[in-house]
From Swiss-Prot:
Disulfide bonds join C22-C36, C29-C41, C35-C47. This is U23-theraphotoxin-Cg1a 2. Expressed by the venom gland. One of its GO terms (molecular function) is ion channel regulator activity. It comes from Chilobrachys guangxiensis (Chinese earth tiger tarantula). The presence of a 'disulfide through disulfide knot' structurally defines this protein as a knottin. The keyword Calcium does not apply.
Length: 50
């Protein structure tokens, strides 16, 4: 039971962290995971539209 609660907490926390990173479309990135959904890491290492 505690494992389920912790798992749910970390999933929500990851989601909030990713939303926190989504403020700017030109955020620096290394991989597509560093960008929010709908954006990808461009060759200039900035989050841009897909």
């Amino acid at each position: 039971m505690y494992d389920e609660i912790l798992s749910a907490f970390f999933e929500v926390n990851d989601e909030l962290q990713s939303e926190a990173r989504c403020g700017e479309k030109n955020d620096r990135c290394k991989t597509n995971q560093d960008c929010c959904s709908g954006f990808r890491c461009t060759k200039f290492r900035r989050c841009g539209r897909r």
